[in-house]
């Protein structure tokens, strides 16, 4: 029992570091003492996110060890509440927004083989004749995340604005497009990188300003652009950002073997075998003194 408590505390400290960043921290303190059985060590943790030292205590979800297998070295079970709280603090911290200069926007379209030379694109920046315009994407409200057997479902309102600069330094909006997007995502981890794949999506336009009947083609263009460019580009950027974050905390030092990320109704399961880095093994053995 002493060894199990030391090991649980050691893993807890390392795990908390991996999923914390700047003003966003996570409280994964034990909810009860670890349990040792004939086949495994089991520990239960809170999983409460802390933003700017303010924590939102949530009711602990029901968990049963029967939800896990017994053929892998390590299992992590996450309630969907943990992922939903992560989306909340990411929104509060202003991380769910993107700004692209006009040239960057055109380059993104080209990257995804979406012809950036169509006549409709100059019309989007029609008021920006002397200075380059900008495109901004942000969430006006916080996204929600749920776990289902088909994948992790992310629902979010999204606003896209095309801006052009004034001489006074302020920006004016030429076009605004608002919609609700629901995506179903599968995740995997390989070669020390996180990969996200889109298995399903739904788009519900809510508002399109400055668009009369003569410019209805702009709305159609934007809807097509979002499905063929917008969603894949955001997922690609999330892959890079999340991989960079977790590897900056040392996750890439572990030899993670055949990891699986499995979504089920109400929870997310990570199962894997792994090799312990020598320097962390030394740290752990020293902590036994």
From Swiss-Prot:
Please name the InterPro entries in this protein's record.
Answer: Bactericidal_perm-incr_a/b_dom (IPR017943), Cholesteryl_ester_transfer (IPR017130), Lipid-bd_serum_glycop_C (IPR001124)
* Primary localization: secreted
Glycan attachment residues as annotated in the record: 53
Q: What induces it?
A: Up-regulated by cholesterol-rich diet.
> What's any GO biological process attached to this entry?
high-density lipoprotein particle remodeling
The reaction(s) this protein catalyses: cholesteryl (9Z-octadecenoate)(in) = cholesteryl (9Z-octadecenoate)(out); 1,2,3-tri-(9Z-octadecenoyl)-glycerol(in) = 1,2,3-tri-(9Z-octadecenoyl)-glycerol(out); cholesteryl (9Z,12Z)-octadecadienoate(in) = cholesteryl (9Z,12Z)-octadecadienoate(out)
The UniProt keywords, alphabetically, are: Cholesterol metabolism, Glycoprotein, Lipid metabolism, Lipid transport, Secreted, Steroid metabolism, Sterol metabolism, Transport
Q: In which tissues is it expressed?
A: Expressed in adipose tissue, heart, and skeletal muscle and to a lower extent in stomach, testis, spleen, and liver.
Report which superkingdom the organism of origin falls in: Eukaryota
- Gene3D superfamilies in the cross-refs: Bactericidal permeability-increasing protein, domain 2 (3.15.20.10)
Q: Which Pfam family would be a valid example here?
A: LBP_BPI_CETP_C
Its annotated compartments are: Secreted
Q: Which purpose does this protein serve, as stated in its record? A: Involved in the transfer of neutral lipids, including cholesteryl ester and triglyceride, among lipoprotein particles. Allows the net movement of cholesteryl ester from high density lipoproteins/HDL to triglyceride-rich very low density lipoproteins/VLDL, and the equimolar transport of triglyceride from VLDL to HDL. Regulates the reverse cholesterol transport, by which excess cholesterol is removed from peripheral tissues and returned to the liver for elimination.
| Family membership | Belongs to the BPI/LBP/Plunc superfamily. BPI/LBP family.
Q: Which PANTHER family match?
A: CHOLESTERYL ESTER TRANSFER PROTEIN
Q: How is this protein named in the record? A: Cholesteryl ester transfer protein
- Specify the species: Mesocricetus auratus
Q: Point out the gene that encodes the protein.
A: CETP
């Amino acid at each position: 029992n002493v060894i199990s408590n030391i090991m649980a505390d050691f893993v807890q400290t390392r795990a908390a570091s991996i999923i914390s960043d700047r003003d966003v921290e996570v409280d994964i303190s034990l909810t009860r003492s670890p349990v040792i059985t004939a086949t495994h060590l089991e520990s239960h943790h809170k999983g409460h996110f802390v933003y700017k030292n303010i924590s939102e205590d949530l009711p602990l979800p029901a968990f049963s060890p029967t939800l896990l297998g017994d053929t892998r070295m390590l299992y992590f079970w996450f309630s969907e509440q943990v992922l939903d709280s992560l989306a909340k603090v990411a929104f509060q911290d202003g991380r769910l927004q993107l700004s692209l200069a006009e040239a960057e926007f055109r380059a993104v379209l080209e990257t995804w083989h979406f012809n950036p030379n169509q006549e409709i694109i100059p019309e989007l920046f029609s008021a920006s004749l002397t200075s380059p315009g900008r495109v901004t994407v942000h969430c006006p409200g916080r996204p929600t995340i749920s776990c289902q057997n088909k994948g992790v479902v992310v629902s979010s309102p999204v606003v896209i604005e095309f801006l052009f600069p004034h001489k006074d330094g302020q920006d004016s909006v030429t076009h605004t497009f608002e919609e609700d997007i629901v995506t179903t995502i599968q995740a995997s981890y390989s070669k020390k990188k996180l990969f996200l794949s889109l298995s399903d999506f739904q788009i519900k336009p809510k508002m399109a300003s400055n668009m009369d009947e003569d410019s209805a083609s702009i709305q159609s263009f934007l809807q097509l652009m979002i499905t063929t460019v917008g969603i894949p580009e955001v997922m690609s950027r999330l892959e890079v950002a999340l991989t960079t974050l977790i590897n900056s905390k040392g996750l890439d030092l572990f030899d993670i073997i055949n990891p699986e990320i499995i979504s089920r109704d109400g929870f997310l399961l990570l199962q894997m075998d792994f090799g312990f880095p020598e320097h962390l093994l030394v740290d752990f053995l020293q902590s036994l003194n």
